[in-house]
């Protein structure tokens, strides 16, 4: 695949997810992303079973290079500033004020690179009454109103992956790409501020729009009821999911697949608005029917009747599906020290060519000597 950002260099002073995720998206598009880490321990996400190559770290740090620098030490700070001088983008996800303490504030970096795109990711924002609060994923989900859309109402507990972290990283990468596009026309850099609160509020746009427009406060079942989305356990213990939306043909197809015409004529379910109002009853009616056949059998019946559906896979099944295998979503590469690395490729395909090339996440300071040599050569050429 074409490496769209191959001529851009990104210096990432990021930890955990938001900063590294932003860097990963740019690296997936071909940028030379150099991860600057603390000597000895590196990104805190590295730590795992006595080692420094955790699955969490691997998730967000492929296609990058690593250099270990203690920017509180004058020698390493100079290397860091020399590195930033070669960069197009700088990413950090510290609390406000911390970057300045380690020589990575915007003012310091503008002195060595005036055209830099400087991206600062925070939890609650660069200013305001909550600016100094520590924030992790669940806090941002909660503050943005999103957590309530995922929380089981009968037994409140946090479920699901780190959506706020991942979403913030995606928005940061999008903003960076926009700033780089502008810079190709103006030659000027930008400061990009993005908080997890703002990112998740935008991601939660549908919920806010419903409230602004009709005064409705959406809950975890609001969208599934209106969209007529369902998931059921089959006779083999595996799950299936389907989404009917509003076209009548999908409901009609479901009734045929079920083989229970009485469900289609039941006044509680015969019309879409009735199905929305009585979704719990409809679930109760369908659940025992789905337990009569295996998931494979139900997929065949729903497919024959053109009902939008899929097996509800676990992660050990999803990429073995024929369509996923056809698309080549799973890719593998070898790290000289850590061995085989398997991941999910970037979702982009430019000019019909998906990107199946991937570099394993670097070990701590894996490219330190290489990067220092590059900087020394650059300095020598400059005289």
What name fits each language-model region?
Residues 1-8, 233, 317-383:
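Terminal low-complexity tails and localization/encapsulation signals of metabolic enzymes
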Residues 1-175, 179-185, 363, 367-383:
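N-terminal helix-loop segment corresponding to the beta1-alpha1 unit
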Residues 126, 153-163, 184-198, 219-224, ...:
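Conserved Rossmann-fold dehydrogenase catalytic segment
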Residues 162-177, 196-204, 246, 250:
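Mid-domain beta-loop-alpha active-site segment that forms a flexible
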Residues 169-189, 202, 206-212, 255-260:
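Oxidoreductase and adenylate-handling cofactor-binding alpha/beta cores
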Residues 228-305, 309:
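Aromatic-enriched alpha-helical interface/lid elements that frame and gate functional surfaces
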Residues 303-324:
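Conserved PLP cofactor-binding pocket of PLP-dependent enzymes
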């Amino acid at each position: 695949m074409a490496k769209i950002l191959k001529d851009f260099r990104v210096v990432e002073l990021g930890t955990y997810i938001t900063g590294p995720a932003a860097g990963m998206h740019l690296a997936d598009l071909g940028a030379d992303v150099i991860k600057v880490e603390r000597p000895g321990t590196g990104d805190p996400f590295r730590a795992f079973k006595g080692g420094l190559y955790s699955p969490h770290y691997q998730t967000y740090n492929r296609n990058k290079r690593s250099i270990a620098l203690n920017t509180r030490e004058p020698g390493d700070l100079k290397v860091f500033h020399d590195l930033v001088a070669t960069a197009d983008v700088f990413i950090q996800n510290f609390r406000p004020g911390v970057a300045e303490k380690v020589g990575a504030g915007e003012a310091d970096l503008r002195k060595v690179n005036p055209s830099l795109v400087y991206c600062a990711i925070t939890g609650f924002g660069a200013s305001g009454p909550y600016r100094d609060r520590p924030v992790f994923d669940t806090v941002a989900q909660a503050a943005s109103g999103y957590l309530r859309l995922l929380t089981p109402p009968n037994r409140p507990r946090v479920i699901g992956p780190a959506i706020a972290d991942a979403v913030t990283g995606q928005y940061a990468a999008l903003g960076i790409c926009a700033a780089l596009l502008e810079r190709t026309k103006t030659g000027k850099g930008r400061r990009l501020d993005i908080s997890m609160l703002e990112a998740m509020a935008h991601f939660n746009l549908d919920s806010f729009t419903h409230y602004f427009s009709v005064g409705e406060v959406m809950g975890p079942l609001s969208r599934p009821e209106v969209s007529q989305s369902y998931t059921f356990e089959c006779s083999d213990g595996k799950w299936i999911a389907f989404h009917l939306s509003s076209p009548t043909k999908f409901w009609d197809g479901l009734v045929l697949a079920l083989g229970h015409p009485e469900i289609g004529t039941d006044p509680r379910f015969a019309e879409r608005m009735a199905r929305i109002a009585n979704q719990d009853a409809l679930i109760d009616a369908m659940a025992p029917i789905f337990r009569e056949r295996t998931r494979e059998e139900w997929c065949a019946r729903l497919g024959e009747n053109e009902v939008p559906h899929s097996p509800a896979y676990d992660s050990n099944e999803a990429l073995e599906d024929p369509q996923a295998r056809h698309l080549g979503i799973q890719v593998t590469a070898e790290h000289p020290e850590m061995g085989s690395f398997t991941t999910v490729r970037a979702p982009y395909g430019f000019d019909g060519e998906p990107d199946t090339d991937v570099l394993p996440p670097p070990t701590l300071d894996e490219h330190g000597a290489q990067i220092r040599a590059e900087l020394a050569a650059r300095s020598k050429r400059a005289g």
